[in-house]
A protein has these predicted regions:
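Generic structural signal for well-ordered, non-membrane alpha-helical segments
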Residues: 4, 8-12, 28, 32, ...
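Short, glycine/charged-enriched hinge/interface segments at domain edges or termini
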Residues: 2-6, 62-228, 373-374, 389, ...
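Helix-rich terminal scaffold detector
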Residues: 1-9, 177-302, 306-312
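Intrinsically disordered, low-complexity, positively charged segments
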Residues: 4-72
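Short beta-strand/loop turn elements enriched in aromatics
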Residues: 28-32, 53-79, 112-127, 327, ...
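Flexible glycine/proline-rich
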Residues: 9, 28-33, 37, 42, ...
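Residue-level signal for inorganic ion chemistry
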Residues: 15, 60, 151, 187, ...
């Protein structure tokens, strides 16, 4: 690493720009019911007005407003009821002047009628009806296209489809939608000290927590994952990287990325001809992170320390992968907000520092009652329940409870 570490802002911009230059994910058409959480591959537009006709929002009577003039409980207006309309009916004829139509919620407004009087302001008659209030033109009418106009964009390309999107699309008659094919991410945990979960423990060994945690987080966001593990051997690492790059759209490694005697990832990337995008970030934890492109695919090399890996995964790898997967950029980036810190952090921060935390209701709490031990980059358990990172700017002293702090919320 010959260049000075770049700022967190520059690192994020660099990986997003690199992701935007990669080939677009291929589209696939799937059933609407299976599309929740998927990314729209093209604009999804309204095929028709919604509602498709003027309709009633309540049970009552469709009327000519002019026929209701002067109506009150003291001087009711009486009209013949000439038709009854339920949701799903199509009016067979126009409503003549001087007549009423019994109408139920959701039923189409008959031609000629220009208002609806709720049944609570009538005697609820079936053959004739007494009106106890005057009604203005267009009162109590839900108009055609009032919710969605034909041709309107319901979900722009790159939108993550939610249950609400699916409901609107179903109301437009969509049975299938075209979405981006999910990217497959290769996860490679490096380290001769690693054991696969379930293997017998041996002295000097640790279980591969990073691989499981990183893979789970990516699956949570809709990625397919292939997970591998290997020893600190540059030839083995190179072979595993090539293998994963053959089958996957991106690769994330953990471990072997710093300046130790067995930190081989920088050499492996150089050997494979990768184009470095980020060569270290000026922050703690996770400063040794590398980001590169190789054969039109993203590669992120993260620290082997669990929290350092988790933090840089959230800050840089996930935004870039989501961008490459077809998401709109604004939905790829951790949202920033300001919260009140409920407990303090006693260490000064010479450089940019990120602390795992839990934000809720405008307040943010550090794990371990703010004890600095809970924020070791090697601490695993302190990540449980966390949903954000607290940003402590370079040059800050100890942070006291009650301080307003910048918070980066994990992308969902």
């Amino acid at each position: 690493m010959n260049q000075p570490f770049c700022s967190p802002v520059k690192a994020l911009r660099s990986v997003l720009d690199a992701a935007a230059l990669l080939p677009s994910p291929s589209p696939e058409t799937i059933p609407l019911e299976a599309a929740c959480g998927r990314i729209a591959a093209a604009d999804l537009c309204a095929r028709m007005d919604q509602p498709p006709f003027d309709r009633s929002p309540l049970d009552g009577y469709a009327l000519h407003s002019a026929d209701t003039a002067g109506a009150s409980r003291e001087t009711p207006v009486t009209l013949p009821v000439v038709m009854k309309l339920y949701a799903g009916d199509a009016p067979a004829a126009a409503l003549p002047a001087g007549c009423a139509a019994r109408i139920m919620t959701g039923a189409p407004l008959p031609e000629g009628a220009d208002c609806i009087l709720m049944q609570e302001l009538t005697d609820s008659g079936e053959e004739t009806v007494q009106l106890y209030a005057a009604v203005k033109p267009l009162q109590n009418v839900v108009f055609r296209g009032e919710d969605v106009a034909a041709g309107a964009v319901i979900a722009p390309a790159g939108t993550v489809l939610t249950p609400a999107h699916l409901g609107v699309l179903a109301g437009q008659g969509y049975a299938e939608v075209t979405v981006c094919r999910p990217l497959t991410v290769g996860i490679l945990s490096t380290g001769s000290e690693l054991l696969a979960p379930g293997a017998p423990w041996a002295p000097g060994k640790i279980y591969d927590a990073n691989g499981i945690q990183n893979a789970a987080r990516l699956r949570q966001l809709g990625f397919a994952v292939e997970r591998q593990q290997c020893s600190d051997d540059p030839e083995v690492i190179t072979g595993k990287m090539q293998e994963l790059l053959t089958r996957c759209d991106a690769v994330i490694t953990s471990g072997g990325v710093s300046v130790g005697q067995k930190d081989y990832l920088p050499l492996v990337l150089e050997k494979l001809g990768a184009q470095l995008v980020v060569e270290g970030v000026a922050q703690k934890p996770g400063s040794p992170m590398l980001a590169a492109t190789l054969g039109g695919k993203l590669v992120f090399c993260l620290s082997g320390n669990p929290f350092a890996a988790a933090a840089t995964l959230e800050q840089y790898a996930i935004p870039a992968l989501l961008r490459a997967a077809g998401r709109r950029e604004e939905s790829c980036i951790p949202a920033r907000t300001v919260c009140t810190l409920t407990n303090g952090f006693s260490k000064p921060s010479k450089g940019n520092r990120y602390l795992r935390a839990t934000a809720c209701g405008g307040k943010v709490t550090l794990p371990g009652a703010g004890n600095t031990e809970a924020h070791s980059s090697g601490a695993l358990s302190a990540m449980m329940g966390c949903n954000c990172l607290v940003e402590i700017p370079a040059g800050s002293g100890p942070v006291e409870p009650g301080t307003e702090v910048e918070v980066l919320c994990f992308v969902q």
